[in-house]
């Protein structure tokens, strides 16, 4: 079953019900309340994976410039207009020129790797030394142009990726108030869920999550200190990976915690995430955590993709899940059965009773 059919089968409805409404967040409901689902038949790259895009470029069906333009048009159609997803803060004005340069390299027989010519959106707390701002969504940093690319941006450019634009986020990556709203920033306003426009997109990588789910780019990059990749990925039915701290450089990323911060890919398939992770990993001498992890990273994470990889794995699930929605609980039971059928062992654990205490310990670390 592909991802789009999986969403239509009902699992998305479960994800949507779990997303809390935007209580306390000032946001206007757009006049056009159609979701990105309503424009499926209009977008020819819907749910295309990175390997599919590469195959299309290799065959000559599409160029990187054509693909980039299609994603830009998609952003204008449903992010800046229509349902007004509001997930992209700005589009790189040089994206098409970069794409054309990469097309020329392809014509000349120079391919940089699996990300050659692939448009990527990145979170607005990651430095780019180009014509785009880096503000963490804050008006306080409006007009800030980085003098140097973040290390992971250097890696993406070297791999042939096209930095298509910057995504909205919970301002300052949600580290500004214990009453802040997921997906809202003073610079960008409120990011919306592509599936339920009035529901919480989660955060702080809200724009990256919405943009990936709505097919506004091939893949996106988020950052996480505490749930900022995994939470928006979960409510948008994405594959979101928070790597072990140190696997990816944090240089050039607006910091919160030196013990918990990391960037990570957010995509529609495990393969796309593995391809992107492979390009991001390298030792950065300016990041002590990266130096400490030297020699521990793989060069190609796609080698670990195995449909039988769940066999023998132990997966912990909360014994007493939050909420009493019978539909959600039924979906959870189906998930357990599916994991068990794939050879995994479900281990019921109890941590919710201790979550407040654990939260206090974590907050002390963050301080």
Model-inferred region functions:
Residues 9-10, 14-19, 26-142, 172-174, ...:
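Short, well-ordered alpha-helical
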Residues 54, 135-148, 154-157, 175-193, ...:
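Peri-catalytic substrate-binding/gating loops that frame the active-site cleft of hydrolases
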Residues 124-125, 165-169, 221-225, 318-320, ...:
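Active-site-proximal beta-strand/loop segments in catalytic clefts of secreted hydrolases
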Residues 90, 288-294, 313-314, 349-364:
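Flexible, acidic loop-helix segments that line cofactor/substrate-binding pockets
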Residues 148-280:
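Short glycine/serine-rich loop segments
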Residues 26-36, 242-330:
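A short helix-breaking turn/cap at a secondary-structure junction
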């Amino acid at each position: 079953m592909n991802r789009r059919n999986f969403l239509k089968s009902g699992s998305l409805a479960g994800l949507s019900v779990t997303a809390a409404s935007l209580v306390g967040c000032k946001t206007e409901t757009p006049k056009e309340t159609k979701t990105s689902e309503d424009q499926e038949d209009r977008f020819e790259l819907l749910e295309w994976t990175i390997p599919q895009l590469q195959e299309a470029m290799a065959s000559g069906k599409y160029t990187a410039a054509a693909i980039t333009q299609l994603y830009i048009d998609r952003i204008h159609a449903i992010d800046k207009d229509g349902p007004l997803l509001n997930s992209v803060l700005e589009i790189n004005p040089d994206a098409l020129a970069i794409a054309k340069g990469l097309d020329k390299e392809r014509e000349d027989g120079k391919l940089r790797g699996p990300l050659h010519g692939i448009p990527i959106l990145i979170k607005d707390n990651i430095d780019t030394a180009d014509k785009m701002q880096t503000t963490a969504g804050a008006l306080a940093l409006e007009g800030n142009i980085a003098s140097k690319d973040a290390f992971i941006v250097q890696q993406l450019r070297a791999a042939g990726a096209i930095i298509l634009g910057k995504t909205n986020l919970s301002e300052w990556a949600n580290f500004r108030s214990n009453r802040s709203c997921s997906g809202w920033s003073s610079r960008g306003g409120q990011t919306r869920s592509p599936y339920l426009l009035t529901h919480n997109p989660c955060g702080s990588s809200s724009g990256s999550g919405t943009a990936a789910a709505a097919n506004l780019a091939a893949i996106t990059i988020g950052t996480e200190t505490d749930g900022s990749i995994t939470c928006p990925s979960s409510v948008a039915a994405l594959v979101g990976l928070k790597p072990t701290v140190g696997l990816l450089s944090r240089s050039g990323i607006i910091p919160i915690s030196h013990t918990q911060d990391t960037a990570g890919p957010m995509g529609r398939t495990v393969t796309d995430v593995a391809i992107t992770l492979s390009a991001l990993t390298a030792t950065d001498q300016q990041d002590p955590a990266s130096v400490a992890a030297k020699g521990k990273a793989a060069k190609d994470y796609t080698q670990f993709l195995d449909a039988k990889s769940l066999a023998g794995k132990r997966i912990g699930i909360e014994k007493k899940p939050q909420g009493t929605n019978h539909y959600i609980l039924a979906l959870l039971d189906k998930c357990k059965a599916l994991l068990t059928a794939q050879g995994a062992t479900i281990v019921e654990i109890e941590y919710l009773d201790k979550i407040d205490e654990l939260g206090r310990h974590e907050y002390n670390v963050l301080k």
